[in-house]
Amino acid sequence: MGGTYIRNFICNFILSGLLLLSPLSMFAQRVDSNLPWSVRMVESEMIRCPESWQLDFQPKLKWDYCHGLELQSMLDVYDRYGNRKIYDYALAYADTMVNADGTIKMYKREEYSLDRINSGKFIFRIYEQTKDEKYKKALALMRSQLDEHPRNADGGFWHKKIYPNQVWLDGIYMGAPFYAEYAFRNNQGDDYADVINQFLMAARHTYDPKNDVYRHACDVSRKERWADPVTGQSKHSWGRAMGWYAMAFVDALDFIPKHEAGRDSMLVIFNKIASQIKRLQDSKTGLWYQVLDKSGAPGNYLESSCSTMFVYSLFKGVRKGYIDKSYLEVAVKGYKGILDNFIEVDKNGVVSITKACAVAGLGGKVYRSGDYDYYINETIRNNDPKAVGPFILASLEWERLQDVKVIVNRK
């Protein structure tokens, strides 16, 4: 926990010095509790991090999937409710990170990391608004990574170059929705089959029939110490990995034509995931555990990022007709559980979301075994972007369901 304390101290120290200098100092330091939850969380994040590059506790510039996740959700809030400051906040990160020639600060294509692709999704919208060619070039640069990204024999992308032969559920979210949207926006219909294959391939490699869950990852080569020698699968089903996978479905399906071969197979898998989410929901709180296949076990805990991801995916899945309307009850119970158990509001109305796993992975230089003790002992922190972003998205779905029509200041 010490590392998190130090990071938070540094971030807060930097922010206190920058607050008076930031154009967002005009943003009220109080949050109106009468506003919708999605807007309240966005305004709270903008208070915590006056400069958008500071999201995810960053003391310096970083091109990262967390920024993409949060800024995408913020643009959704802007689209629904207005407030130009929200758009400008997202634009500031894009303008800072994308150079005039379309290169991206801190992005190294040759690393072949799917994590670096996710932020491209909000850049689509920035380009759509600005028509600045540098964003079009940046999108093409990220898309070109996928042409040469290392793959397994079945066409599945490696999660990263440093993780050879490995398929992580996290990576499906990081790469596939961007891939699908790029194909849609650029009339590259031949790519849909490859996008769909990423989902189907991940399901084949990670499904655990004994526990009826999808495990965090699979090493197709069976060489990693964390991998089962027969299946190649990791030891457990990590909540957030399943959350990433579920969100990937509902976001990518937006762009894949209904007639496309294999799309129906995606829907079958997503329906299976929805049934797993329903079965694993904690009956008392409506939430989900950090390690899904050990729900309720000693040391396991109800975790906010997977809970918000599941709720968003179910809400959107029902709205889009991907899953049965009966799942709406599961989503509503989960959303209310999030508000009751994870959301805190301070005296100024600033909203926080608590109890998020900061990070979890497999292998690496400081080796991560992927056993039960590993997952339950990773750092837990508040206002992690991987909980904040999906909470905003889930809240927007809830507000759409309630037909909330609050008009936020559009100046």
Show where each model-derived region lies.
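Long, well-ordered core segments of solenoidal/helical folds
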Residues: 34-54, 88-105, 137-156, 189-225, ...
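CBM-like carbohydrate-recognition segments
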Residues: 30-66, 80-87, 96-114, 118-120, ...
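Oxyanion-binding "anion nests"
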Residues: 246-295, 299
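Inter-helical turn/loop segments and adjacent helix faces that build the functional surface
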Residues: 81, 182-193, 252-264, 317-325
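Bacterial Sec-dependent N-terminal signal peptides
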Residues: 1-30
